[in-house]
């Protein structure tokens, strides 16, 4: 996987061509409606029937634009995958914790369009996101995964994430308690040397 990473104006630029039609690049404001549609599909799919939308917070396009710009100002990657000009997934990293001691650790999220699941989009986004986070100087990457999401667990394992925590019964949906697995991987030299300040 060859990623072209450069820094311009404090923002890591990620443009990654893969074999096949999917292209990974930094997100833009014009991509927000497509990203929002992907996000809302996954949020609504994860909510019990009978729970009204006004009972949980859903962002609108302006919220997502603000979040995206805030992430980019803090040198946090916000990337997407497109296939033939159509947005098929996106990924981003945010600070793991707000306190300064944790500034070299990020947590990440990846969302893939429902019609493009199991086509390698998540794999391409994960590789590009790891590369962008490492290039930005982050040293650890954290993820939280529903324990029933075997595909996501396998993807993270394939990219060197190890299981570092298990949170039993922290969610309730579809009539059952759900567990969360916490995964982590090192970026760049990880903890073998102090960060460059």
Map each language-model feature to its residues:
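Acyl-donor-binding surface of acyltransferase catalytic domains
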Residues: 1-18, 164, 185-187
């Amino acid at each position: 996987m060859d990623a072209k990473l450069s820094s311009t104006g404090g923002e890591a630029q990620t443009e990654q061509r893969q074999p096949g039609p999917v292209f990974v690049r930094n997100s833009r404001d014009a991509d927000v409606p497509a990203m929002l549609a992907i996000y809302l599909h996954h949020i609504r799919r994860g909510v019990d029937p009978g729970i009204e939308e006004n009972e949980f917070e859903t962002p609108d396009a302006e919220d997502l634009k603000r979040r995206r710009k805030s992430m980019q100002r803090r040198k946090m990657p916000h990337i997407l995958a497109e296939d033939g000009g159509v947005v098929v997934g996106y990924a981003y990293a945010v600070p793991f914790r707000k306190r300064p001691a944790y500034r070299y650790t990020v947590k990440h999220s990846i969302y893939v369009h429902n019609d493009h699941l199991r086509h390698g989009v998540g794999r391409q986004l994960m590789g590009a996101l790891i590369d962008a986070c490492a290039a930005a100087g982050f040293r650890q990457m954290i993820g939280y995964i529903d324990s029933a999401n075997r595909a996501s667990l396998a993807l993270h394992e394939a990219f060197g994430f190890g299981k570092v925590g298990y949170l039993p019964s922290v969610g309730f949906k579809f009539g059952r308690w759900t567990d969360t697995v916490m995964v982590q991987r090192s970026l760049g030299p990880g903890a073998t040397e102090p960060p460059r300040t």
